Amino acid sequence: MKIIVPATSANIGPGFDSVGVAVSKYLTIEVLEERDEWLIEHDLNPRIPKDKRNLLIKVALQLAPNLQPYRLKMTSDIPLARGLGSSSSVIVAGIELANQLGKLDLTDDEKLDWANKIEGHPDNVAPAIFGNLVISSVFKGAVSSVRADFPECSFIAYVPKYELKTRDSRSVLPFKFSYKEAVAASSIANVAIAALLQGDLVKAGRAIESDRFHERFRQKLVREFPNIKKLAKKHGAYATYLSGAGPTIMILAPKDRAKLIQTRIEGCKYNGEVFILDVDRDGVRVEF
């Protein structure tokens, strides 16, 4: 059995802690033979545990404490601590592992409830579960989400070599907004989502780049952001935004402009990689 979970790009400008989209990089968990103790084989960061201390197993055992241990193989091309939902993908995989091995028969909404409790916010875990574009809210502990088709376009991701921890990225945010600022910021988010739902990427792009919730505070943590945003706009991009807490910079562009934008960014010789990604429409899936 294989469990496959997509990467995710959260916030998308003004959709702070609420909006996310699944994209085409993946975490894969292969379930092999039964064992007396959990073993997770991987060639990822050496700091990632290979036993029951791994986040994958910790999550699975929260849902099903008496799971039979297995030998697992973990592979991933999702960059770690870069704003592409690497930890969220592991959380969703752990929930699905418990669901399958423990025969829990969870609905997608139940998976999201669990994932939100563990992660603390739904913007990454929701699209990892449902696929596509997902808009979520949490009120009095209850998660509500809406899945929709993301308009056809390419995602060009510039992924720096340096990490940016979520806690560090959150530390630069203000503790409060004035009522006037909150109204302005939420109205921009409303337009961004409505335009995405209508497939109007030009109007959506303007709203995405007008975010007032977080990007103006976080941009100073990602030194390449201003130049890449300017370059992308020059070559026909709809929008450039910080993916999640950063430092990945995500560009939305027409498919016929993606390769050009990728080449131009690579020509800047920044210390990072550039990927062209697509929307993942499926979310977490299981292959037998």
Swiss-Prot record:
One of its GO terms (biological process) is threonine biosynthetic process. The keyword ATP-binding applies. Pathway: Amino-acid biosynthesis; L-threonine biosynthesis; L-threonine from L-aspartate: step 4/5. GO terms for cellular component: cytoplasm. It catalyses: L-homoserine + ATP = O-phospho-L-homoserine + ADP + H(+). Pfam families: GHMP_kinases_C (PF08544), GHMP_kinases_N (PF00288). Keywords: Amino-acid biosynthesis, ATP-binding, Cytoplasm, Kinase, Nucleotide-binding, Threonine biosynthesis, Transferase. Its EC number is 2.7.1.39. SUPFAM superfamilies: GHMP Kinase, C-terminal domain, Ribosomal protein S5 domain 2-like. GO terms for molecular function: ATP binding; homoserine kinase activity. It is found in: Cytoplasm. This is Homoserine kinase. It comes from Streptococcus gordonii (strain Challis / ATCC 35105 / BCRC 15272 / CH1 / DL1 / V288). The lineage of its organism: Bacteria, Bacillati, Bacillota, Bacilli, Lactobacillales.
